[in-house]
Amino acid sequence: MRTLYADIIVDISHEKLDKTFQYRIPERLRDRLEPGACVMIPFGNGNRLIKGYVVSIGDQCQFAPEKIKEIAGLPEKETGVEDKMIALAAWIRRNYGCTMIQALKTVLPAKQTVKKLEHRQLVRLMNREELLSLLGECERKKQVAKARLLKALSEQETIPYEWITGKLGVSAATVNSIVKVGAAKLVSSESYRNPVKVQAGETTHNTLSSEQQTIITEVLTDFDAGRRQTYLIHGITGSGKTEVYMQLIGEMIKRGRQAIVLIPEIALTYQTLLRFYQRFGDRVSVMNSTLSPGEKYDQCERAKAGEIDVIIGPRSALFTPFPNLGLIVMDEEQENSYKSESTPKYHARETAMEVAKLYKAIVVLGSATPSLEAYYRAGKGEYRLFHLTKRLTGGELPTVHTVDLRQELKEGNRSIFSRKLQELMTDRLSKGQQTILFLNRRGYAGFVSCRACGEVMKCPHCDVSLSEHKGGRLICHYCGYTQPLPKLCPKCGSKYILGFKAGTQQIEDKLKELYPGVRTLRMDADTTRTKDSYEKILSAFSNGEADVLIGTQMIVKGHDFPKVTLVGILAADLSLNASDYRAGERTFQLLTQAVGRAGRGALPGEAVIQTYQPDHYAITCAAAQDYKSFYEEEILYRELSGYPPAAHMLAVQIYGKEEENVKQLARRLTDVVKSNMDFLQILGPTPANISKINDIYRYVFYAKHAEYDTLVAVKDCVEETLRQWQPRQLSIQFDFDPVNVL
């Protein structure tokens, strides 16, 4: 019998070991090993046992056979990687800059096997007459617990063991005594854990609008004809994108296919899951970070076994091992949380398209405010674009009031609530309607502005706001430009130059001062630390247990509250002035989403946008819910500045404990890239936005080019340089088309 060999990636994340090592497959494991399997192998001079993953199997020996070590065995509890996921891991490694073991662990949704839940039941063996006779005997002997159990058995043939020991209060010894006399027997069975806590309701199939029907018909026509592509649905808030997703999923299930529904935040899971569960029942499940290891493992096993058709979750749900995936839906595709912030820094949108290729599936992106990347690609014909232009309720979009905070200050109002917002809140409270107050803190990085005229201190070289640092200096986190904090506004001469520091707690306190007795709920990082906190807050507000919901960006994403008729956006300028080229896009997206929360029921809605820059195109376009005008302005800025999507961008971040060593390596690497690729545009190096975390210093430089593959070559150049130099106690991270300033 010919000898078989396995190429193995070892479970050590180090650049020197980022390659395959060949091992001989012992006879006893020949029939148990396949690509993706987790194995134990002797490694290094000391032959210490470590884990590894098999990526290929063959009969060609790369070295002298006597030098090839043998696989030691299979570890307990470790899960393997699905065959298609190995190819995906290789793609992630190449395109995002990481080791193969990091990529393999990324595509493993459940890391360990876990025993199934054991269910024990007591099953009656005696007929009812015999049982009643035994019951009478126990009552005469005053065997109270035994009699209680026999009475229950006489009324039902099967009783769950948990109910016996819990509700009936009967001990295990008493149960065993009944089993011993032949009155009943204990039966054990195993089942998968199901993390879905919602109750199935009435199945509803809404009447489709002509726009919705067109999308469904054309997507399915393409699919049935064997055409595979990515679709972008640009639908205003309340236009019925979710119904389109559900109809498409239903059609995929009829065709024997499964679907993955990606959502941007854990906070969306409860409401989204409820809608899907009401439609598809227990064939729906969820995959997210709040699940226990047992729950994660069981959802993967249920998916592989064909027990579920739909999985819902954030970007990690993308790696669910369905056997015949047909559709990936990416709702709110513009959201930053679709980009991983840890290595590998993959984007779910690009990765979903690669997964779809492997399964011959399709991708449907949906948003009221598509990312510039998605809309840009649709414009170039890479995606097929559909529009949903009408609200399903038939209602109008909310009336929007833009309040100039400079004018409020001039007229003596120093409150965080403008007079218009106070007037409308008073009206809603008197009518028993609900209000959402949104603090736009996303991307806040210590920007400084003039409270009198609204002027923001900006970098003269990068057209992003400068960030305030200790020592009274302002710094640009792209090119490193720095200047002292001015004492007077350079535009109007005012001395009112400062940053915005209000948080949700202060807003809640001020609201209660203004309206004693008002019922409030807060949704922010502090109030959503526990596993079920999102669901509890959303459910309480939906049930009318509060008049006002106060929160950050998580409260404006996709939630439907029919009684909300007013949305107040307290500080639109916070995200607008983040030191980030995407600041305008993020502001427009958040404001549009926030405004869209009002008037989603039968009652009309209103929104108030408070800002120091009422004429900025991100503000005016959001107030008008005019995406096209915003896109035309913003894409012009990106093209002129050479930012994504008009070009691609790579951030190379250098870490280390000694700042001088980090700075020197950043400079040397920048020089190497410049000398090898002098056609590139390079920014930096400069200290990172947060220049030190846990005593680790961070520097960054950026490379820009029209072709993504050119930046992959930059990554390869940096990696090869590091292999030659072998710097000690320093590490590198790559971030392609970063969504946040590093």
Per-region residue spans from a language model:
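Accessory, non-ATPase domains that flank or precede helicase/AAA+ motor cores in DNA-metabolism machines
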Residues: 1-367, 379-395, 676, 702, ...
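Inter-lobe coupling/hinge segments of SF2-like helicase ATPases
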Residues: 203-209, 213, 217, 227-663, ...
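Hydrophobic, Leu/Ile/Phe/Ala-enriched alpha-helical segments that form helix-helix packing faces
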Residues: 511, 595-598, 673, 677, ...
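Extracytoplasmic/periplasmic
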Residues: 660-675
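Short conserved micro-motifs at the rims of enzyme active sites and ligand-binding pockets
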Residues: 664, 694, 713-714
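Short coil/turn motifs at beta-sheet boundaries
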Residues: 1, 16, 34, 82, ...
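A carboxyl-terminal module marker
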Residues: 671-694, 719, 732, 736-739
